A protein has these predicted regions:
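Catalytic Walker B motif of ABC-type/P-loop ATPase nucleotide-binding domains
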Residues: 158-161
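Conserved catalytic motifs of ABC-family nucleotide-binding domains
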Residues: 154
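Conserved ABC ATPase "signature" region
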Residues: 109-128
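ABC ATPase NBD coupling module
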Residues: 64-78, 109, 224-227
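Conserved ABC ATPase signature
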Residues: 133-137, 141
């Protein structure tokens, strides 16, 4: 469904992506792991067409992402942002229904609210939450609202950017379980960026290790712990010594 071939991207003299080769089938969940500053966010932006690669090709079902009609293309995606990225001035339901009240996905206001309340229910939040403002919610509740917003428009592809950052282990486990359940129910294709190895094991079908602008290893999550790849082993066990410099 999504394929990257020979993708490179530099910013000045800094080579962020140096020939990415990656493929993800429809309905599968890929988790990209790697240290801070290794290009994971740039990779996502390239897939979305928000950053233009210097070289290489990225296709979605065979179509170049850079030549796709923008609104229709972006309507196929949902995203859970690292910091929640909720609009403080909008009520919870308005945040969830944000894409349903404008653009090609626009619905009547009452219908958009109804969908938002249903998506909130799906992530474990009652209808009484709908008219609150984000500041009235805990961090875990805000993360659930972000997840509800990501799925509100029934996207084919969902990006999760550090979905458990800032959450305690119990709430992180709840979010991981919700992500796995919802992605499976929807039959969506998912790409997740995370440093949290518990999340990796909970939500991944496949894992790709990104370091120094290259995919150093990719494979089924069940093979991650047994691979002899030194980059993967150092990263997943948090070792200070190995091919990845401890100070970057």
């Amino acid at each position: 469904m999504i394929e990257l071939s020979g993708v490179t991207k530099s910013f000045g003299s800094k080579h962020v992506l140096r020939g990415i080769e990656l493929q993800l089938d429809r309905g599968k969940s890929l988790v990209v792991i790697g240290g801070s500053g290794t290009g994971k966010s740039v990779l996502l932006k390239c897939i979305l067409g928000l950053v233009r690669p210097d070289e290489g090709l990225i296709t979605l079902e065979g179509q170049n992402v850079l030549t796709a009609e923008r609104e229709a293309f972006l309507a196929r995606f949902g995203m859970l942002f690292q910091g929640g990225a909720l609009f403080d001035s909008l009520r919870v339901w308005e945040n969830v229904a944000f894409r349903l009240m404008r653009g090609p996905l626009k619905r009547p206001k009452d219908e958009a609210r109804e969908i938002a309340v249903e998506k909130l229910r799906r992530v474990g939040l009652g209808p009484e939450t709908a008219d609150l403002f984000p500041a009235e919610l805990s961090g875990g509740m805000q993360k659930r609202v972000g997840l509800a917003r990501a799925i509100a428009a029934e996207p084919e592809i969902i990006f999760f950017d550090e979905p458990t950052t800032g959450l305690d282990p119990i709430m992180a486990g709840v979010i991981n379980a919700l992500i796995r359940e919802i992605v499976t129910e929807m039959g969506a294709t998912a790409i997740t960026i995370t440093h949290d190895m518990t999340s990796v094991r909970a939500i991944a079908d496949r894992v790709a290790m990104l370091h120094d602008g290259l995919i150093r290893w990719s494979g089924p999550v069940g093979e991650m712990d047994s691979t002899p790849d030194p980059y993967v082993q150092q990263f997943i066990h948090g070792r200070a010594t190995g091919p990845i410099a401890a100070v970057r």
